Amino acid sequence: MTGPDITIVVVARERFSLAQRALECLYAETALPFKLVYVDGGSPTRTRRYLETEAKKRGFHLIRSARYLAPTEARNLGLTQASGKYVVFIDNDVLVRAGWLESLVRCAQETGAWLVGPLYCLDEPAFTKVHMVGGIAHIEVRDGGRYLVEKHHLPGGRLEEVRARVKRAQTELVEFHCLLARTQMFERLGPLDAGLLSDFEHIDLCLAVREAGGSIYIEPGALVNWVTPPPLAWSDLPYFMLRWSDAWNRASLRHFRSKWRLTEKDPNGHYEFVTHYRKLALWPLRRRIREALGWRGGTWFERNALFPVEEALNRFLIP
């Protein structure tokens, strides 16, 4: 395996404050040679300068946009610069553990998979709690309608317990926190669907791969950890609020439903979930409100005052 055989594309998931920690971890924990393409969409000055310095020092290709980019748009920009047999997409808030890349590549080589996902962990301390080990994602036709069936496998388990139970296997679902794809696959499928601004992009790709006859595998020998918010730095907030804005969420929902001809208005509750997820930006304020009003009073205030104001303000600022 030589460097040009693997391109790693890093993009911002929802914030920038983890960029330095994640990039340093990537280099420290990755032994296999790779080409790095880093797509920086509108990061704050401190992060921008750090990435410019690191790009010169380490020799990776930095694509800089002055404006914020939707993650799918950023991945497509990175994909235009990818070379070699495999491309790995990874978010800028993900930590990796030694051997992760070798395990993903080995799985692709031995199975012929079009997509390979690692065992995904989340939260801090890192590599203790499981986010998912693959899952299901398919369209079910029933009662004259088309419905999305989606579920994570083994979410919330302790890593040491889950890892002892799982092994490499075919799956229907991997996520863009980190995944390996065959570069040649995009010659057949085309680029990632840029109409999916904030949600459904991982499901869309998995559905498209399986519809085209490709296979998807989960490789638990590869470990990554998504560092979830909160906290969010003040400099993270503008992008975070756009990334999960009602405008982007609704556009993604409409596009995904239309593309896959779905009957349900909110497939698997995704719109409801991402709308609530955006409110993580309010967590410091919510904590103070609950300290002042108690759990019951604070919850009432959130539902009847804070959340409606946040939603109206988000729609006003990001039409």
Regions found by a protein language model. Name each.
Residues 25, 38-49:
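A conserved acidic beta->alpha catalytic loop
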Residues 65-82:
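Glycine-rich, basic loop-to-helix element that forms the pyrophosphate-binding segment
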Residues 72-73, 144-181:
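A recurrent flexible, glycine/aromatic-enriched loop bordering the glycosyltransferase active site
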Residues 24-33:
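Short, acidic, metal-binding catalytic loop of nucleotide-sugar glycosyltransferases
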